[in-house]
Amino acid sequence: MELSELKEWLDELYDRYDSPDFIENDPIAIPHSFSKQEDIELCGFLSATIAWGNRKMIVRNAFRLMERMDRAPFDFTCNASEQELNRLCDFTHRTFNGGDCIDFIRGLRHICRSYGSLGRFFETEYSANGDLRVVFSRFRTRFFEAEHRPHAEKHLSSIDRGAACKRLCMFLKWMVRNDSRGVDFGLWKTIPASALYLPLDIHTGNTARALGLLHRRQNDWRAVEEVTEALRQLDPLDPIKYDFALFGAGINGLLR
């Protein structure tokens, strides 16, 4: 398929799938239930953190987590007492357990107290160096400066170890992109959509390989860079708009 034909096809899929009609069973549905920016940011991060496995289970468990945080994730993160944090002890999503959840709240609290909010961390750090790869590394380092158990570290991928950082890339997409379609939020104005990286998983990876957008076999950070650079050839200003298009084509068997 010629590049122009591929772009036309992916643009059609983007128009089909990048719509509020398709987000009911997507993890982005949970932060859409909030209106305050700081709540959207923290809910979005925690929802993205548990975004693996069955999508309906992800959404259900993320809503359960928000209920335990009194549907006020920013206030809970910054101000919850130890007794209130213990409400999270029996929360589980697959291998993400209650102890991990509490450790993540501690990490987020450390970030929010240091920078004022989660968004201010990412915007401040991006403004300082202009490279999301550096920001991802800095975020993980600062996040785990807070007290935590080693088990929690497995749930925040390390770009320094070559991980694809799918959930962090997805969270950044939600916060940065603004296409006025009511899907992504576009809250962080100082980070351009052109700087984002594709949230790479088995579905988007296999679809990208089938389309010739990705040749690397492993779904690691080098693959993320390769496929993102290919998508920038299709749309330099907003390459990650094709995320839903690749995902939808993969799970709906459009390449068969």
Task: Please provide the spans of the model-predicted regions.
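HhH-family (HhH-GPD) DNA N-glycosylase catalytic core used in base-excision repair
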Residues: M1-R256
